Amino acid sequence: MLELLKVSITGDLSSGKTEASRVFQDLGAYVISADKVSHSFLVPHSHIGRRVIDLLGPEVVVDNAFDRKVIAEKVFDNLVLLQALEAILHPEVRRIIEEQYYQVAKERKHPLFIAEVPLLYEIHYAKWFDRVILITADENIRRERFTKKTNCSDLNFYQRCARFSSNEEKKMHADIVIENNGTKEELRHKVEEYFYALKGAL
């Protein structure tokens, strides 16, 4: 029997998901990121890469690699294209996350399995996990973090936020809600508390 708790971290854009995941990793949890997984397998000459090129056109490949800025420009204003792209990528992301979970569980080296999945509810993936942690922050704080980190405009922030479902709705379904309106140190203390609570959950 695999006795390793499956925990997903999710939340809106620039809420602090990655920072929370980093704290869990520092404490000994195994952490996998859905975004990093998709980056790892999305190469032009792979089967999935060819499907993406067929969908979006050859101009999304620059210097034998996918240009993520070009992809973003193509899909963020086109819901049909965005959904078609996600239909290609998300099943593979899920397959890799689940495959990795079973490998990590067999090794018995980590107290928790953490998957950072930004669009967890939007892709109907929450039920696979034993616990869901929702990281939240006020919109003005998230906007400031996003624009400072990316040098993108407020408009770009709101366009990207449109992909996420209602935060209030997600709060109703999450097992744990961590508010992240303060400092990184404050977030760390909150995550540490939940780490030890979850560690003893099985």
Curated annotation (Swiss-Prot):
SUPFAM superfamilies according to UniProt: P-loop containing nucleoside triphosphate hydrolases
Residues that hold ATP according to the record: S14, S15, G16, K17, T18, E19
Keyword Transferase (UniProt): yes
A GO molecular-function annotation: ATP binding
EC number(s) per entry: 2.7.1.24
Pathway assigned in UniProt: Cofactor biosynthesis; coenzyme A biosynthesis; CoA from (R)-pantothenate: step 5/5
Entry keywords, A to Z: ATP-binding, Coenzyme A biosynthesis, Cytoplasm, Kinase, Nucleotide-binding, Transferase
Enzymatic reactions: 3'-dephospho-CoA + ATP = ADP + CoA + H(+)
Gene Ontology process terms (BP): coenzyme A biosynthetic process
UniProt-listed Pfam families: CoaE (PF01121)
A cellular component term, taken from the record's GO annotations: cytoplasm
Main localization category: cytoplasm
Subcellular localization: Cytoplasm
UniProt xrefs under PROSITE patterns: DPCK (PS51219)
Domain DPCK: 6-202
Described purpose of this protein according to its UniProt entry: Catalyzes the phosphorylation of the 3'-hydroxyl group of dephosphocoenzyme A to form coenzyme A.
The family this protein is said to belong to: Belongs to the CoaE family.
NCBIfam families: dephospho-CoA kinase (TIGR00152)
PANTHER family to which the protein is assigned, alphabetical: BIFUNCTIONAL COENZYME A SYNTHASE-RELATED (PTHR10695:SF46), DEPHOSPHO-COA KINASE-RELATED (PTHR10695)
The protein's name in its UniProt record: Dephospho-CoA kinase
Organism lineage: Bacteria, Pseudomonadati, Chlamydiota, Chlamydiia, Chlamydiales
Gene giving rise to this polypeptide: coaE
